[in-house]
Design a protein with these regions (language model features):
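Accessory C-terminal segments flanking Radical SAM cores
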Residues: 236-380
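Radical SAM enzyme [4Fe-4S]-AdoMet core and its adjacent flexible, acidic
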Residues: 43-44, 116-118, 126-128, 133-290
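Conserved alpha-helical substructure of the radical SAM core
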Residues: 1-118
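Structural motif corresponding to alpha-helix initiation and N-cap regions
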Residues: 50, 80, 106-109, 132, ...
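Short cysteine/histidine-rich zinc-coordinating motifs and their immediately flanking basic loops
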Residues: 44-48, 357-369, 386-390
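Short Fe-S-cluster ligation motifs
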Residues: 59-74, 372-400
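Structural preference for beta-strand elements that scaffold enzyme active sites
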Residues: 19-21, 69-71, 96-98, 122-124, ...
Length: 400
């Protein structure tokens, strides 16, 4: 074995999450087509108060060192007047808060500077097309694209790291090479390519076929030679990374061996023409987290979920500590056991490094342990099974 294609968590994800996402509010003036939260213009009266939000952050810090990543999302977090104070308090606790704002008029250079001064480590911005017309249509308002690009520049000038999020749907597949070029040219610490989960307003958007998803995953892997990129709710990207490393070591044609389609070939051709692909090893995918396995989501009203895209409440931070819910809630414990998976995911040799999107499985079937709907891989079909052994971890014993 000459390289490790995957990063491994340096913590016991049964004891502490890698990332905690807090939905600070659902208030947001935009009307994005894919919005998980189905955001509303006004704040909900049952949102966590400032005092309760501080207590939540103390609970996050109680997971110990290294502290989980702590992301404040929405709606639009700028709808909360206590946002800067909460970021500052999180920093005092030893957290490194990141903020995921919407591209509203509140996203000004002054507010971005205040976020940095309060102690925010990074922000994430959404770019779902490479042109103003296409992006603004997706977001529901004119001017959002130009405001996003201006905020991108202002955030970097203020000293904030910037992550760019892109939701992949049938509407913007052809835009992916151009969005990648924006990420390269403007600079970002990470490009997060999110595979749509049909929740909230996103239920109305057309799903990718498994073949299209596979083509996009391999295209994203190719971009990793130039652009720092990861996937969200596309856990089979880790399978792709293992397959591609083994095929590269054998000098095999990955497109032919894996039956990649015309979408992949078109995206790759356009990206190569733009200088977005080089003949060198791609960056490894970030640490694997999945719903309830390294990831926990706290809603605006305090309910705790394995993911923001898996709407099954497992407790409430107003009633039980977050540490207790994450470690002991039956669904969280079950989600950390690959042996609970069914269908092709349950039979797959990659299940311990992938596991499929539990959120998408639930959204499409009502069964959180069902097979990943956007994965077309047939277990056992990879032709070099013997070479897989060093890359696939031994599965942990089931949590009792």
């Amino acid at each position: 074995m000459t390289a490790r294609p995957l990063r491994r968590a340096r913590r016991d994800v049964g004891a502490a999450p890698f990332i905690v996402i807090w939905e600070a509010t659902r208030a947001c003036p935009l009307a994005c087509l894919h919005c998980r939260a189905e955001a509303r213009p006004d704040r909900h009266p049952g949102e966590l108060s400032t005092h309760e939000a501080r207590e939540l952050m103390r609970q996050v810090a109680a997971f110990g060192r290294p502290a989980p990543l702590f992301v404040i999302t929405g709606g639009d977090p700028f709808e909360r007047p206590d946002l800067f104070d909460l970021v500052r308090y999180g920093r005092e606790l030893g957290l490194a808060p990141s903020v995921s704002p919407s591209a509203t008029p509140a996203l000004t250079p002054a507010n971005l500077s205040r976020l940095h001064e309060a102690g925010a480590a990074a922000i994430s911005l959404s770019v779902d097309a490479a042109t103003a017309a296409r992006h603004d249509e997706f977001r529901g308002y004119d001017g959002v694209f130009s405001r996003t690009l201006a905020a991108w520049r202002a955030a970097r000038q203020a000293g904030l790291k910037v992550q760019i999020n892109t939701t992949v749907t049938r509407r913007n597949l052809s835009q992916l090479p151009d969005i990648a070029r924006l990420v390269r040219d403007h600079g970002a610490m990470l490009w997060s390519v999110f595979f749509l989960v049909p929740t909230g307003r996103g239920r109305a958007l057309a799903a990718l076929s498994p073949q299209e998803a596979e083509d996009v995953l391999h295209f994203v892997h190719d971009l990793g030679t130039v652009v720092p990129v990861k996937t969200t709710e596309a856990h089979h990207f880790r399978r792709v990374a293992v397959q591609r490393l083994i095929l590269a070591e054998r000098g095999a044609d990955h497109a032919a061996e894996l039956g990649l389609g015309p979408l992949y070939r078109d995206l790759r051709r356009r990206a190569r023409r733009a200088g977005l692909i080089r003949e060198r090893r791609a960056r490894r995918p970030p640490v694997d987290v999945n719903a309830g396995r390294g990831l926990v989501f706290v809603s605006h009203t305090g309910s705790v979920h394995p993911s923001g895209f898996l709407p099954v409440a497992c407790g409430d931070v107003r009633e039980r500590p977050l540490t207790e819910i994450y470690r002991n809630a039956p669904l969280f414990r079950a989600l950390r056991d690959p042996g609970r998976l069914s269908g092709r995911c349950g039979a797959c040799e990659f299940r311990a490094v992938c596991g499929g999107s539990r959120s998408r499985a639930y959204a499409c079937t009502g069964d959180v342990f069902a097979e990943e709907p956007w994965c077309g891989y047939q277990p056992g079909s990879f032709p070099y099974q013997r070479e897989l052994t060093p890359y696939l971890p031994q599965e942990e014993a089931r949590e009792r």
